[in-house]
A protein has these predicted regions:
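C-terminal region of N-terminal signal peptides and the immediate post-cleavage residues
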Residues: 22-32
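Bacterial N-terminal signal peptides
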Residues: 11-22
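Bacterial N-terminal signal peptides that target proteins for export
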Residues: 2-13
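Conserved short hydrophobic patches within well-ordered secondary structure
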Residues: 2, 25-26, 231-233
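GH16 jelly-roll
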Residues: 30-297
Length: 297
């Protein structure tokens, strides 16, 4: 996610990020763990992080069981994830396989709305275990901007200093409808794009998904996280797994801390789509939908 908006959320979750965050994730991938099918808006595995906005279970013929969890971002919501709608796992998880079948928020009625939908791991304890002089910020992100629903953002964070916006992250941005990798970058500041190695840039092409729209169609998204890399994928309409990014980079660029898993929708005023500005506060309720969520063992 755009780290300039994360400061408020760090405070919100400080109490929930226990000493388990200091434990490095297991060195081998674990078997599948809890699966939440969202037969109710409440869950033994997740909780709603703030009193703002709303969760609900709604009928949805496109969901596997005919219903889905609806995350509602209210009209007029202020910027920052802490002012959005967000769920978080009750436990911390490490290396393993994470996946979810979901639809991002749809703002087609307000094309310039600044709204992010995300599914991601998150851990920050302000330590500097890697010794690079920056506070650790471990995060694996899958995100979309509702103003450009054909584009997906994949990011690995290891460090972020909120006081000066110094950071360490690698990211890939893909226009899935066109089958075009827009960028694959290493960054130490916002807006920077340093070329990555061949091992960090695989595959070098991604096939187009005709008509892809993250906000109108359910897709399964997931990633397999290990000590040596993160493999991001999507399951298309025919049931085939499509590799989006098979990151095999330096260990220093791969998150290691046990993390909570989160899904959210929130208003941003400083993250624009490619080619145009979209920062408007939502003028109507917007909804993201989650069919199911799979956590690692």
């Amino acid at each position: 996610m755009n780290r300039t908006t994360a400061v408020g959320r760090i405070a919100v979750f400080a109490a929930t990020l226990s000493a388990a965050l200091l434990v490095t994730a297991n060195s081998t991938a674990a078997p599948a763990g809890p699966r939440e099918n969202w037969t109710s808006a409440t869950s033994p595995h997740f909780y709603k992080t703030t009193s703002l906005n709303a969760l609900g279970r709604v009928a949805d013929s496109a969901a596997n069981d005919g219903s889905a969890l609806r995350l509602t971002l209210k009209a007029g919501a202020a910027a920052n994830p802490g002012n959005g709608i967000e769920i978080a796992s009750r436990n911390n998880y490490g290396f393993g396989s994470y996946s979810t079948r979901m639809k991002a928020a749809d703002c087609s009625a307000q094309p310039r709305a600044g709204v992010v939908t995300g599914a991601f791991t998150y851990a920050t304890d302000h330590s500097d275990r890697n010794g690079n002089g920056l506070p650790d910020n471990d995060e694996i992100d899958v995100e979309w901007l509702c103003a450009q629903p054909e584009v997906i953002y994949l990011t690995l964070w290891t460090d972020y200093n909120a006081s000066n916006d110094q950071l360490r992250k690698v990211s890939r941005v893909i226009d899935l409808r066109a089958g075009r990798i827009i960028s694959t970058c290493f960054s130490t500041t916002f807006g920077e794009c340093v070329a990555v190695s061949s091992a960090e840039n695989q595959p070098t092409s991604v096939a187009a998904i005709p008509g892809y729209n993250s906000s109108t169609q359910y897709y399964e998204y997931g990633f397999d996280w290990s000590a040596t890399g993160v493999h991001f994928y999507l399951v298309n309409a025919s049931g085939a797994r499509v590799t989006l990014w098979d990151y095999r980079g330096p260990a220093s660029r791969i998150p290691t801390k046990q993390s909570i898993f989160m899904q959210n929708a929130w208003h941003t005023t400083n993250w624009d789509p490619y080619g145009f500005q979209a920062r408007e506060r939502p003028n109507r309720d917007l909804h993201a939908h989650v069919d199911w969520t799979q956590l690692p063992g």
